[in-house]
Regions:
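Non-catalytic DNA-recognition/assembly elements of restriction-modification systems
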Residues: 1-57, 186-270
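Sequence-specific dsDNA recognition surfaces
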Residues: 41-60, 75-103, 270
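Short, surface-exposed loop/turn microsegments at beta-strand edges and helix-strand junctions
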Residues: 61-69, 78, 84-87, 99-101, ...
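Well-ordered mid-protein domain cores that form the structural environment of catalytic cofactors
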Residues: 77, 94-95, 107-117, 148-162
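A structural connector/turn signal
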Residues: 95-96, 123, 167
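Intrinsically disordered, low-complexity, charge-biased terminal/linker regions in eukaryotic proteins
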Residues: 100, 110, 150-152, 159, ...
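A short beta-sheet element
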Residues: 109-149
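A short glycine-rich beta-alpha junction/loop motif
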Residues: 126-134, 166-188
């Protein structure tokens, strides 16, 4: 059973609501704890140059990486391998500079599974992110690693994902992120946290590079060529960039379980 003591001021601030789920929710409890912090309280808006998402825009998808730029969705920001993400046309994408990501930013998923945070590294840099990713570009008040570490902590996550009255919200807006309180930690503590975050980010980049190099070594040793979209069976709608796969099967090879082409593909059978 969870219990807590609250003041009349808190009850008044919540419209005189006495129901326990409001006052005992993790988000409200985190904000209450922030009030007892020995350091000055700022907000994410105070310690950021900008907090925003790119909004919606028209996208033209392409297959050739030379003609496009990688677009990341809310789930992709957590992936280590971004080579298989969708590519959109450079020519037909306006205001690319405003949509491009920079190293050191905190990226937040604001739709779907909300509140997931990523510390942008070299893999994210200069790629684009959709309207489902909020960017936090820190200023010089707090170090960038500290801002990320706080937002990804249980306190930051609770305040990101819960509304004013403790309910779980379905979508995060930049204004929600800006209003989150964050302590103005001492410089020595900031340096310690930021150094650890920067080291972790560098190690992640090195690990990704090592994995990519290992993949190349394996392909060369096994004499495997790089796969293209044509190497995968495609049975979707007509697409100028993809050839529809086709093959012949004898009637006796098709049972009553399914006549879906994908299930009878030669690649699946092998």
């Amino acid at each position: 059973m969870k219990t807590a003591s609250i003041s009349f001021r808190e009850v008044k601030g919540f419209g005189f609501r006495f129901d326990a789920p409001v006052h005992l929710s993790e988000g409200v409890s985190a904000k209450r704890l922030m009030q007892s912090c020995p350091y000055e309280l700022l907000t994410i808006g105070d310690v950021s140059e900008r907090v925003w998402h790119a909004g919606r825009w028209r996208r033209v998808y392409v297959n050739n990486p030379n003609n496009g730029i990688t677009l990341l969705g809310s789930s992709a920001i957590l992936k280590s391998d971004l080579s298989k993400e969708k590519i959109i046309s450079v020519k037909y994408t306006e205001e690319k500079e405003d949509k491009a990501l920079k190293k050191g930013w905190t990226l937040i998923s604001c739709s779907g599974t909300i509140g997931n945070c990523a510390f942008a590294n070299a893999q994210h840099a200069e790629k684009l992110a959709s309207q489902h990713v909020i960017r936090v570009s820190p200023n010089n008040i707090l170090r960038e690693g500290v801002v990320y570490a706080f937002l990804v902590s249980k306190y930051g996550y609770s305040m990101l994902t819960q509304g004013t009255f403790g309910s779980v919200i379905q979508h995060i807006e930049p204004e929600n992120v800006k209003s989150i309180p964050i302590p103005h930690f001492p410089d020595s503590f900031q340096k310690e946290v930021d150094d650890l975050m920067q080291e972790a980010s560098s190690l992640r980049e090195e690990a990704i590079d090592e994995l990519n190099e290992a993949g190349k070594v394996l392909k060369n040793a096994a004499k495997l060529r790089a796969l293209t979209p044509e190497d995968y069976d495609y049975y979707g709608l007509n697409n100028s960039g993809r050839k529809v796969s086709c093959f012949i099967r004898k009637r006796k090879d098709i049972d009553t379980t399914t006549i879906n082409a994908f299930n009878h593909s030669e690649r699946i059978r092998n």
